[in-house]
Amino acid sequence: MNLSLREIQKLLVTVAADVARRRLARGLKLNYSEAVALITDHVVEGARDGKLVADLMQSAREVLRVDQVMEGVDTMVGIIQVEVTFPDGTKLVSVHSPIYK
């Protein structure tokens, strides 16, 4: 199986997001990398489902609450930018203050 660098990066985000979901289900708080992966995966999968950029920017801010991440993670994650392929082309989705307070 030959994967491009972009495909490898997508797979890594997906795996990290899956780990984050399992840790949340066990009641554990997420670290920076897990939180970013989970929100990024939400945006990528939402685009794949055909959602609009504006809808994804809003819904991504509701994926995690401050009580679900380790102390300080909410301030470390000021913005998440994801380049995503939509049916009408590739777009940059920016999610400001992605962890719900």
UniProtKB/Swiss-Prot annotation:
Pathways per UniProt: Nitrogen metabolism; urea degradation; CO(2) and NH(3) from urea (urease route): step 1/1
Please state what class of enzyme this protein is.
hydrolase
List the GO terms this entry assigns under cellular component, sorted alphabetically.
Answer: cytoplasm
Q: Which UniProt keywords apply?
A: Cytoplasm, Hydrolase
Q: What is its EC number?
A: 3.5.1.5
Identify a single GO molecular function assigned to this protein: nickel cation binding
Gene Ontology terms describing biological process:
urea catabolic process
Q: Where in the cell is it found?
A: Cytoplasm
> What reaction gets catalysed by this protein?
urea + 2 H2O + H(+) = hydrogencarbonate + 2 NH4(+)
Tell me how this protein assembles.
Heterotrimer of UreA (gamma), UreB (beta) and UreC (alpha) subunits. Three heterotrimers associate to form the active enzyme.
Q: Which NCBIfam families match?
A: PRK13241.1 (NF009712), urease_gam (TIGR00193)
Family listed:
Belongs to the urease gamma subunit family.
User: What is the protein's name according to its record?
Assistant: Urease subunit gamma
Q: Which organism is it from?
A: Ureaplasma urealyticum
Q: What is the lineage of its organism?
A: Bacteria, Bacillati, Mycoplasmatota, Mycoplasmoidales, Mycoplasmoidaceae
Q: Which gene encodes it?
A: ureA
